[in-house]
Regions:
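A late-sequence structural motif
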Residues: 26, 165-200
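Secondary-structure junction motif
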Residues: 91, 95-119, 184
Length: 200
């Protein structure tokens, strides 16, 4: 059960690593609740793809997408990855298929490209960015399709799939990694907030 008592005098700092899409979807509520309980704790947020974060040793807590077949970390959430495009547009009908995806070293991008390769569907990486908001802006303009967590799909977009000639996508396992060399009461308390926040 998450600690709910407010401790305004607790001080310290925590370094968190997380991909950009998880920041947009989950972290605002988590950090807001944590700041209310521990207003003096400094949180240092590093946004990078999961692949890059897994190589780092200097973070206290890391939220990443787990590769299929691995058992690292504490499971926070499993969520479907879906294809999406803007309402009123049909970029999925274009040949080659225009994609808007994160830059390289993104597991979701690799899964999408591998799935399209497996069904021999021609595609092009029309737009790439490290920013989720940039990717979604391109998709909202009807310029490309994307593959993202289902919970990230906004009301101005629609989920597409096999009916539109697209391959099924796997579910993403989102996990929390703790750095055993830098644990503290502050770090563990924020970890509790993260675990609870991903359930909401």
């Amino acid at each position: 059960v998450m600690t709910t008592l407010r401790e305004p005098h607790m001080v310290g700092s925590v370094r968190i690593g997380t991909p950009d899409d998880y920041v947009m979807r989950f972290m605002p509520g988590i950090l807001s609740r944590f700041a209310q309980a521990y207003p003096l704790v400094q949180v240092e947020l590093h946004c990078e793809p999961s692949f890059n974060l897994l190589q780092r040793q200097d973070l206290d807590l890391t939220i990443v997408t787990r590769e299929p077949g691995t058992e690292i970390g504490q499971l926070l959430r499993q969520e479907r990855i879906v294809w999406a495009e803007a309402n009123g547009f049909s970029p999925h009908e274009q040949e080659p298929l225009p994609l808007a995806m994160f830059n390289s070293q993104c597991f979701c991008r690799a899964w999408a490209c591998n799935a399209l390769d497996a069904m021999e569907r021609e595609y092009r990486l029309a737009y790439t960015s490290p920013s989720l908001s940039a990717i979604m802006a391109v998709v909202s303009a009807g310029l490309a399709i994307t593959a993202q967590l289902q919970s990230l799909i906004s009301p101005d977009m629609r989920i597409i799939g096999e009916a539109e000639g697209l391959p099924p996508m796997p579910s993403a396992s989102i996990v929390l990694l703790r750095n055993t060399h830098s644990q503290s009461p502050v770090t563990e308390t924020l970890a509790e907030h993260i675990v609870e926040g991903f359930k909401l």
